[in-house]
């Protein structure tokens, strides 16, 4: 049995993650009220929130800037994967990490680009509808990212004069998880590949 080409493997990973991410987001968006929470276990909840910012609900800069940044980053990652897919200097694991990061970036880009057009507004009292008659809640590139995974892994009480705190509060989605896993594994096990191009460039300059 022939080994799957790295390029095809990356494409499959990207497609599977994007499809799973979008199916989950559409289900949550059309089945939950905004801020509604569903307890799966004592340490894992589905908690529907929307954010206009970056991964894990972080807000930085304008909405248009963030969306354009995501689009450019996704395009650059796709180009990098295409260029190195058959390069033996880069391991399969490294390309898988890039594919996960790319899939996560594209998954959130889709929300920003189209969700404002194809959904009406989610509120604590009304569920959103896909392709509503009155149109969407925002213009192109101004959609909100749907988040739902919440892991309150540990909790404790501070003194009475301090607020109650919960460890790991950010709510995130499958796309965020793909980006995080790809980045963590990349840094822990494949960081040496990030300097391959730089080292090759230096060697070529010395040989001139």
Task: Report residues per predicted region.
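Alpha-helical transmembrane bundles and membrane-interface segments of multipass inner-membrane proteins
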Residues: 1-208
């Amino acid at each position: 049995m022939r080994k799957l080409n790295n390029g095809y493997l990356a494409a499959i990973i990207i497609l599977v993650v994007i499809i799973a991410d979008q199916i989950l987001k559409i289900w949550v968006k059309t089945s939950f009220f905004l801020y509604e929470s569903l307890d799966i276990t004592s340490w894992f909840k589905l908690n529907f929130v929307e954010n206009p910012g970056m991964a894990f609900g972080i807000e930085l800069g304008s909405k248009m800037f963030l969306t354009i940044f995501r689009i450019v980053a996704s395009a650059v990652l796709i180009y990098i994967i295409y260029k190195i897919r058959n390069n033996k200097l880069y391991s399969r694991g490294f390309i898988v990490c890039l594919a996960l990061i790319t899939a996560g970036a594209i998954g959130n880009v889709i929300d920003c680009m189209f969700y404002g057009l194809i959904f009406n507004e989610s509120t604590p009292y009304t569920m959103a509808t896909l392709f509503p008659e009155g149109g969407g809640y925002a213009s192109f590139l101004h959609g909100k990212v749907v988040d739902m995974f919440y892991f309150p892994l540990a909790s404790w009480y501070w003194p009475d004069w301090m607020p109650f705190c919960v460890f790991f509060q950010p709510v995130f989605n499958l796309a965020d998880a793909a980006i995080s896993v790809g980045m963590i594994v990349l840094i822990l096990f494949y960081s040496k590949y990030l300097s391959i191009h730089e080292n090759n460039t230096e060697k070529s300059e010395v040989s001139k």
